[in-house]
Design a protein with these regions (language model features):
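A short core secondary-structure module
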Residues: 144, 152-153, 157-203
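N-terminal glycine-rich flavin-associated loop
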Residues: 91-111, 137
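Glycine-rich beta->alpha junctions and the first turn(s) of the following alpha-helix
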Residues: 3, 200-297, 304
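Amphipathic, small/basic residue-rich leader segments at the start of a protein or domain
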Residues: 1-94, 115, 119-122, 250, ...
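Short Gly/Pro-enriched turn/cap motifs at secondary-structure boundaries
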Residues: 93, 135-138, 162-165, 180-182, ...
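A short, Trp-centered hydrophobic/proline-enriched beta-strand micro-motif
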Residues: 123-131, 175
Length: 305
């Protein structure tokens, strides 16, 4: 693929560079700085609001939905330039922009679009993905979490796992089984769920690093109003495909290894800095190569759409 900018793309890149130079530094995280979860979320929301005010939130989202109405290549350009700064961009923001908004925009009602889209673009709402289960990961259609209709609500029981940042999310996108008597792909229904709903128990999973980015999420008699169903009954698989397309296109994170290299270069060691250590250099070089491969794959996927 051709990585050279067209005349129009070069002009957009120059515009983005100038805007980022004026607005990104005050939001940037210093190399080696460790933030609490609460600070990460607060700063991530503030940076998202800055982008919204500047017209860079939801670059590919149609203007009718409050986005910029730009091209996928413009989104790639912005990501590349934004990646030059160490900014607070966690999954609690990315899931909303890259997964929740596409499915709500494509399958949601006008009322759902009005309720969720602008607030998410502004960084006022954070999101998690409630898909994977202990016995349904790669085989997503095998989910067992059940939803049964009761009046104007659906009552949900089940368990989800590996829910990134669910413990700090306002809303979740949820796929459940509503009809166990049909082919598994056809018995699914899609909801958005308020993570503060009674019956939701989010349990952080402690990682070896000490952080807790992932969670187990238990749903016990959780009542979800039918107005929070996305699409119709049995249309959950189509909604999932919309979400997963957005997820695949959002893979790759620019600038993380460069930031780590800068930190290593500034961190003293027994002789020189950490970056002078051959084993550190090798580890960073390996990580950089993997990051670049992932970024090139992302660019290829985006330009194939």
């Amino acid at each position: 693929m051709d990585f050279n900018d067209t005349k129009e793309e070069a002009a957009f890149r120059a515009e983005v560079k100038a805007w980022l130079a004026a607005h990104a530094p005050k939001h940037a995280i210093a190399p080696g700085q460790v933030l609490s979860d609460a600070d990460q979320v607060a700063r991530g929301k503030a940076w998202q609001r800055e982008k919204y005010d500047g017209g860079y939130a939801g670059i590919t989202l149609p203007k009718t939905l409050g986005g910029r109405g730009g091209t996928i290549i413009e989104a790639v350009v912005f990501d590349e330039e934004e990646g030059r700064y160490h900014l607070p961009k966690g999954p609690y923001i990315g899931i909303g922009l890259g997964m929740a908004l596409p499915v709500i925009g494509k399958h949601g009602t006008p009322q759902q679009i009005e309720k969720f889209v602008e607030a998410t673009l502004k960084g006022e709402l954070t999101w998690c993905q409630l898909f994977s289960e202990p016995s349904a990961g790669s085989d997503l259609a095998a989910v067992r979490t059940r939803a049964v209709k009761d009046g104007d609500d659906w009552v949900v029981n089940g368990q989800k796992v590996w829910s990134s940042w669910a413990h700090h999310s306002d809303w979740g996108i949820l796929v459940v089984r509503t009809d166990p008597g049909v082919v598994k792909h056809k018995g699914l229904t899609f909801f958005v769920v308020d993570m503060k709903s009674p019956g939701i128990d989010v349990r952080p999973i402690r990682q070896i690093s000490g952080a807790s980015d992932f969670n187990e999420t238990f749903l016990t008699d959780v009542r979800i109003p039918e107005t929070d169903m996305i699409g119709g009954v049995g249309e959950g698989w189509a909604c999932c495909m919309t979400v997963l397309t957005g997820e695949r296109l959002s893979q790759g994170e620019k600038g993380k290894i460069a930031s780590l290299m800068a930190y290593a270069a500034d961190t003293p060691a027994s002789t020189g800095t950490q970056l002078d250590d051959a084993s550190v250099k090798l580890a960073l070089a390996t990580a950089y190569a993997e990051e670049q491969a992932q970024n090139y794959l992302q660019a290829r996927l985006r330009t194939m759409v």
